[in-house]
Amino acid sequence: MSQNKYWQSFGEVNDPENLKNLSQDEFQEELPFEGFDDKGLIDAKAPRRDFLKYLGFSTAAATLAASCKIPVKKAIPYANKPENLVPGVAKFYATTYVQDGDVVPVLAKVRDGRPIKIEGNKLANNSFAQGGTSARAQASVLDLYDMYRAKFPLHKVKDKFEEVPTFEQFDKLVGDAMKAAGGSVVLLTSTIVSPSTKEIIAKFPNLKHVQYDAVSYSGMILANEASGFGKRIPSYNFSAAKVIVSLGADFLGTWLSPVEFAKGYSKGRKIDEKNPSMSKHYQFESFLSMTGSNADERFTHRPSETGAIAVALLAELGGAVAPSIADAKMVASIKKVAADLKANNGAAMVVSGSNDKNVQIIVNAINNAIGAYGTTIDWTRPVNYRQGIDSEFAQLVADMEAGSVGTIMIHGANPAYNHYDADKFKAALKKVKLRVSFSEKMDETAELCEYIIPNHHYLESWGDAEPKTGIVSFQQPTIYPLFKTRPFQTSLLRWAGDTKDYE
């Protein structure tokens, strides 16, 4: 054990007793007010001399503080003032927030050339977000000024990233490496909702495109295909539903398109002359959610009972054999909900948050039985977000493990962080000869890549989005790119041999 002794000052070494006394008496003089603690400041008594002393000190301090002027900051005018710019007066630009499959038409508030606030665009197409916005969209302006953004193209040399001075040099490095890698070329992205981007991807020679979503809706897509509706997700009209039944779908919080659903849901919950009755909302779930907390009636169950409850509900509607459920209260609740669905045939809907294909097939059968299709659920205008298929991503990982993938380019996806088997993905990714990332930040997946060419932030970009078939929203830049970044679409064009720019 160490025998070293430590002191805070020389006084503690030379004269510890005196130092102790001095420290105890440092604030020995008490306030010269009698009865301050009991009577308060108004009734306190103090000697005239002490009163004048403290009054003089406070007056002098106030005079001194007032005489200290705040440093003058001079505003330097523009040498060439931008057109239609008034210093201090904000302007608004309509654009579209697109990230990880989420799509929200927004208005960006720009002051002195800098975006400072994001709001919903009430002038956008009323059949989608209807002027709503989300917490993620509101916070996205902070990403623009994030000090950890990738500021220029990077190339990993001996486990250390180095800056590539020009885009031309970067394109040559990647082009040469792509030829040397051989094998198949794969583009891994989150769901792409941009029609123009899809065209560019389709023109890239011998490119395999795999879409991956951190929150998967693969079970729903495959169930819809098995039910004869095609490999797609329908539009849900919550405003037209008099009865809403949710089987674990947090449609006001995170499920599919909560901004759009919250707007429709709120319309059905308001009572006025045109709508004298309010919609009824039943929620079956295993944990409390934003949607569950707003339900008229909420029923809790174990996560393992989700499928049984869906089958029991279908059985009450005459479409299946009722399963055995031990909870008598739950059985009674299911009967009550089924009766309400029957009474509102054609004006009800059932949604499920399960990613189990079989559960979603049962939910489709329930909606068919209550006449939801064509009224509250619309197949004529399917959505284009959340299109990732789990089996396609699993096949990609298997191909990487087998060494058949020569080049992989990754945009808007971070499976090394948010995939349930991230370690397996990391090990497979390391077997790919050429790994390129378009990430705006050095995330867990980008760290494993050899080349990084950061994409523009959406507030710096031109672009388009089609969240639903026939509904298009556009992106426009609200600020000049802050760093040496480039649209990932332009990179694809360059590496495909096209000299055009995306923007």
Regions from the language model: what does each represent?
Residues 165-169, 180-181, 205-206, 212-503:
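Non-catalytic alpha/beta scaffold blocks inside enzyme catalytic domains
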Residues 1-328:
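N-terminal export/assembly segments and adjacent metallocofactor-ligating motifs
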